[in-house]
Amino acid sequence: MKFCPKCGSMMMPRKENGKTVYKCSKCGYIDTENQKEAKITTVIKHSAKEKTLVLESDMPKTGVQLTRGISCPSCGNDEAYFWILQTRSADEPATRFYKCTKCGKVWREYE
């Protein structure tokens, strides 16, 4: 890890003109010294049981949970993500949305 000598921000290794250099994301300063030390590595590991949820524009960014025992009307899968939104007036119950983990179908359930 390196810090920018001009502004003190953390510098990140980047590819510039085919070479790996440290570049400050705040002020743009480029450190060309010690290029051999700069290394860009991306490692993504997932266990067999772990799932990655990709939130799409039709899903809220918080409050998403996984549930089992709800049958998808499209493919019959029994696992879905769900979230709750207040879609009607405040004196009405909230609406629960589901998204199938297998086919991606989104459906709603009124309480």
From Swiss-Prot:
Q: Is Zinc among this UniProt entry's keywords?
A: yes
One GO cellular component assignment for this chain's record is:
DNA-directed RNA polymerase complex
Q: Gene3D superfamilies per the record? A: 2.20.25.10
Zn finger intervals (TFIIS-type) = 68-108
Name the GO terms of the biological process aspect.
Answer: DNA-templated transcription; regulation of DNA-templated transcription
Q: Where are the zinc fingers (C4-type)?
A: 4-27
Where on this chain does Zn(2+) 2 bind?
Answer: C72, C75, C100, C103
Checking SMART domains in the record gives: RPOL9 (SM00661), ZnF_C2C2 (SM00440)
Q: Quick one: which residues bind Zn(2+) 1? A: C4, C7, C24, C27
Which superkingdom heads the taxonomic lineage of this protein's source? Archaea
Keywords associated with the record: DNA-binding, DNA-directed RNA polymerase, Metal-binding, Transcription, Transcription regulation, Zinc, Zinc-finger
Q: What does this protein do?
A: Induces RNA cleavage activity in the RNA polymerase. In its presence, the cleavage activity of the RNA polymerase truncates the RNA back to position +15 in a stepwise manner by releasing mainly dinucleotides from the 3'-end of the nascent RNA. The truncated RNAs are able to continue elongation. Involved in transcriptional proofreading and fidelity. Misincorporation of nucleotides during elongation of transcription leads to arrested elongation complexes which are rescued by TFS-promoted removal of a dinucleotide from the 3'-end.
Q: What is the official name of this protein in its record?
A: Transcription factor S
